[in-house]
């Protein structure tokens, strides 16, 4: 049996505490005796499970988990997620996966030590020019940009994709929705250290002049209709599945949204509502200058430090 991958220098992060428990107690006081059984069932459903997460280097055992998270990002888009997953595993000098912290043998919990709850990595699209999945990603972004943006933005993005002197890195940071955003800070910090080391050692994925990011976002249903609106969505209208990606959005020199309403058929990408307001699932594409990453890291540190 293969040994478990080495731990990354990332802090353990407990899940964020919910505020549902207090609300449930108030509701129970107002319920009739006939509803007690239903309340008990709700209490079980809302029970908080305290799980700690830890980061590990990416290994072959993480293939299924990474591919699943990539499929949630791309949905039905024509991108070979199997090939992309293999590339991320091959270049495991960068990137990390989030797993549950080791559980003692006498624990009653059934834990799959290979189950991943999220990952972070980067694919240098410029270095990988000609690789099928890298070309598919660029073609997808350009096609969606053409559909949702003005011609000038499409031309700008096309020039950047073809500028071999200024590499574009595709930043991937995906996790399940129950993983707290606080884990994003050490994960991104570690990735930046690994990218800097790769650059010094002349390894793949080294220096990136731009970072491309596709973020899972939501907007109130009925908004984001016109082409101009989709390419210039107001930040306060967008809700980010990964809360920290709002800081990347603020520094992006190019950004646009596209709807995935027709492609979404899962819990993480399907029908959403906040305060009884129906939400429309989107993907938000951003291009961030590499020299803005230190400012973004400071923002993450300010808002996500545990």
From Swiss-Prot:
Annotated GO biological process? DNA repair; microtubule anchoring; microtubule cytoskeleton organization; mitotic spindle assembly; mitotic spindle organization
Q: Where is this region: Disordered?
A: 1-45
Q: Where is this region: Interaction with CDKN1A?
A: 153-251
User: What InterPro entries does the entry give?
Assistant: BCP1_family
Q: Where is the composition biased (Basic residues)?
A: 1-10
Cellular component per GO?
A: centriole; centrosome; cytoplasm; mitotic spindle pole; nucleus
Q: Which UniProt keywords apply?
A: Cell cycle, Cytoplasm, Cytoskeleton, DNA damage, DNA repair, Nucleus, Phosphoprotein
Q: Where in the cell is it found?
A: Nucleus; Cytoplasm, Cytoskeleton, Microtubule organizing center, Centrosome, Centriole; Cytoplasm, Cytoskeleton, Spindle pole
Q: Has the keyword Cytoplasm been applied to this entry?
A: yes
> Region annotation Interaction with BRCA2: residue ranges?
51-159
**Is the keyword Nucleus assigned to this protein?**
yes
Biased region (Acidic residues) positions are: 18-45
Cite the Pfam families for this sequence: BCCIP
Q: Which residues carry this modification: Phosphoserine?
A: 34, 104, 273
- Function according to Swiss-Prot or TrEMBL: During interphase, required for microtubule organizing and anchoring activities. During mitosis, required for the organization and stabilization of the spindle pole. May promote cell cycle arrest by enhancing the inhibition of CDK2 activity by CDKN1A. May be required for repair of DNA damage by homologous recombination in conjunction with BRCA2. May not be involved in non-homologous end joining (NHEJ).
What family is this protein classified in?
A: Belongs to the BCP1 family.
Instruction: State the oligomer form and interacting partners.
Output: Interacts with BRCA2, CDKN1A and MTDH/LYRIC. Interacts with DCTN1/p150-glued and ACTR1A/ARP1. Interacts with alpha-, beta- and gamma-tubulins. Interacts with TENT5C; the interaction has no effect on TENT5C poly(A) polymerase function.
Q: What is this protein called?
A: BRCA2 and CDKN1A-interacting protein
Tell me what organism the protein belongs to.
Answer: Bos taurus (Bovine)
Organism classification, top ranks?
Eukaryota, Metazoa, Chordata, Craniata, Vertebrata
Gene, per the UniProt record? BCCIP
